[in-house]
Amino acid sequence: MSFEQTIKMPEDRIGVIIGKNGHVKEDIEQKCNVEIDIDSESGDVQVSSQASRLDKMEPFKAIEIISAISKGFSPERAYRLLKEDLLDLLDIRDYAGKSSNSIQRIKGRIIGKAGNTRKTIEDLTGASISVYGHTVGFIGSFEEIRIAREAIKMISKGSSHKNVYNMLQAARRRAKFEKMQLWEHEGPQPSNRTDF
């Protein structure tokens, strides 16, 4: 028994999944123990693996990595998915409707001047963010994605960048405080030694 799944890639992302001299494709194949066949004309990317690999989730990780690359992430950022990180997508059309002008305006607000808004959200949450087409992609832990997604929703609904940054900084302080409390509650463990 074997595993096989086909993913449709946008035409302008085919070159990224192949990589220079085929290195990205080979890298994904090696890291995930899969075979990848790419049809450059149709945009179909077929991932296949032997059944023995399914218990390690490797083929599914390959599909997640390819999906992330198709949504605008660089291969290096997509490789975060090999760890415990997750991929999540948000459709800008939920906030802009189908108007291409509204979609472009919201994308511009999310990216910011010279990419500063996106970079600030990434820095304050730890999530990687990609804006491609009408979607915003997130890679990170559940909590990183939750906070970054909330920031993007606020921007998409028209909140000022200042309010979004304030929310992000408050969330960051709260997370640090919770981490400190966890450390205090665990604290150093008493020694069981009796030979003092």
Please report, for each region that a protein language model flagged, where it lies by residue:
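RNA-contacting regions in translation and RNA-metabolism proteins
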Residues: 1-196
